[in-house]
Every structure is written in structure tokens, then in C-alpha cells.
Amino acid sequence: MNENLFASFATPTMMGLPIVILIVLFPSILFPSPDRLINNRLASIQQWLIQLTSKQMLSIHNRKGQTWALMLISLILFIGSTNLLGLLPHSFTPTTQLSMNLGMAIPLWAGTVITGFRHKTKASLAHFLPQGTPLPLIPMLVIIETISLFIQPMALAVRLTANITAGHLLIHLIGGATLALMDISTATAFITFTILILLTILEFAVALIQAYVFTLLVSLYLHDNT
């Protein structure tokens, strides 16, 4: 049966109900809790990655911003693991859904903005009007700054969706071309297969980079409001 090019991005359903939440939560069952007192290599690597990430993300924050440490670490681990699991064959990637990415971006962005208005009301309002603005340009700049503020969560979600979707489409297209060329030209099929392997390696890097970029931008929004 021929699949649509965008079939892998359709939300899977069971008895008419979306099972995205089940897909997202199921990988946690695959990692049993360790019973040993000394951590194994996998746990040591996880701790090292968490420490490195927290050092990069939280070094710019004050004490109020550092209260978001658990949220930021959980966010980067969730997005990174979801992106990596989506690279498995015949799997579903939740981060290709704009609705899910907006569901992550809007509450996090709103939380940073509300935190800013609660603790730094004057400084938050000052962002809408740069210092030294000529009087005739004040209404226009306030409108522009307001629009740019509300575009931030949309930019977060669209960036993640577009990058993950584009990579999956390229893998799908090059993989289909490789299968089609196997009966026509073995040498050409080998070249496209090599490109497919390199692109897959690149997608593993993109999956981690996009998780880092998403979390870093949330961290920067938090830094501007604390």
C-alpha cells in the first residue's frame, strides 16, 4: 500500500481518539529505575549532560530565574528524547505537530511574561518603548513591540516544527529515491544511500540542537523578565 508523503505526520488515533499522550509517556516505562548504589555509564552520561545543560542555561539567571532549573532541564530532555525517538523507522514524532509545540511554547512564554510583570513591572513596560524614541513614533513603536512580544511563542513553535518536519521529509524523499534507483542503477542507488546515511546522522544532530535552541530561547525570555 502506498503511503502519502505526509502520512508519518498525521496524528495516530485509536478508536477515534488521539494517542499522542500515550506515545509521549510510553518511553519512560522503558527506562527501569536503577537498583545499584553506584551509577552505571548511562546514568553517569545523563548526569553529565544535565549538569552541562544546567550550567549553560542557568549561568545568566539570578535566584528567581534559577527556580526554573527543573523546568528547563525537563524541557530539553523531553524535546530531545522525543525528537530522537521520532527518527526510528515507522515511528511518530509529536514535535512535528504545530499544535503540540504551541502547547509547550505558549504556557512557557506566558509564564516568563507574567513573572516579569509581577516582579519587574516598570522594566517590563519599558520594553514597549525604547529610550529616546521621538514623540511622533511612540504609538507605532508600542504597536510594533507588542506584536513582536506576542510573536515569540509562535516563532518558538514554528521553528521547531519546520526543522523537524523538513528533516523527516528529506529522509523520506531520499529513501524513496534510493529504493526506486536500486532497479535502475546500482551505483546511483549507492550514492543516494550514502547521502541518506549522512542525512540521518545530521538529523540526529538537528534533533538535539533544536531541543537546545528551544530551551535556550525560553531561558533567554526568562532572563529578560527576571
Swiss-Prot record:
Transmembrane helix keyword on record: yes
Alphabetized UniProt keyword annotations: ATP synthesis, CF(0), Hydrogen ion transport, Ion transport, Membrane, Mitochondrion, Mitochondrion inner membrane, Transmembrane, Transmembrane helix, Transport
GO biological process annotation, one example: proton transmembrane transport
Segments traversing the membrane: 12-32, 68-88, 97-117, 138-158, 164-184, 189-209
Compartments, record wording: Mitochondrion inner membrane
Example of a GO cellular component annotation carried by this entry: mitochondrial inner membrane
GO MF term set: proton channel activity; proton-transporting ATP synthase activity, rotational mechanism
Reaction equation(s) it catalyzes: H(+)(in) = H(+)(out)
Domain of life: Eukaryota
PROSITE patterns: ATPASE_A
Pfam families from the UniProt entry: ATP-synt_A
Main location as per UniProt: mitochondrion
Membrane topology: Multi-pass membrane protein
Listed InterPro entries: ATP_synth_F0_asu, ATP_synth_F0_asu_AS, ATP_synth_F0_asu_bact/mt, F0_ATP_A_sf
Family: Belongs to the ATPase A chain family.
Function recorded in the entry: Subunit a, of the mitochondrial membrane ATP synthase complex (F(1)F(0) ATP synthase or Complex V) that produces ATP from ADP in the presence of a proton gradient across the membrane which is generated by electron transport complexes of the respiratory chain. ATP synthase complex consist of a soluble F(1) head domain - the catalytic core - and a membrane F(1) domain - the membrane proton channel. These two domains are linked by a central stalk rotating inside the F(1) region and a stationary peripheral stalk.
Quaternary structure annotation from Swiss-Prot or TrEMBL: Component of the ATP synthase complex composed at least of ATP5F1A/subunit alpha, ATP5F1B/subunit beta, ATP5MC1/subunit c (homooctomer), MT-ATP6/subunit a, MT-ATP8/subunit 8, ATP5ME/subunit e, ATP5MF/subunit f, ATP5MG/subunit g, ATP5MK/subunit k, ATP5MJ/subunit j, ATP5F1C/subunit gamma, ATP5F1D/subunit delta, ATP5F1E/subunit epsilon, ATP5PF/subunit F6, ATP5PB/subunit b, ATP5PD/subunit d, ATP5PO/subunit OSCP.
Protein name (record): ATP synthase F(0) complex subunit a
Gene name, Swiss-Prot/TrEMBL: MT-ATP6
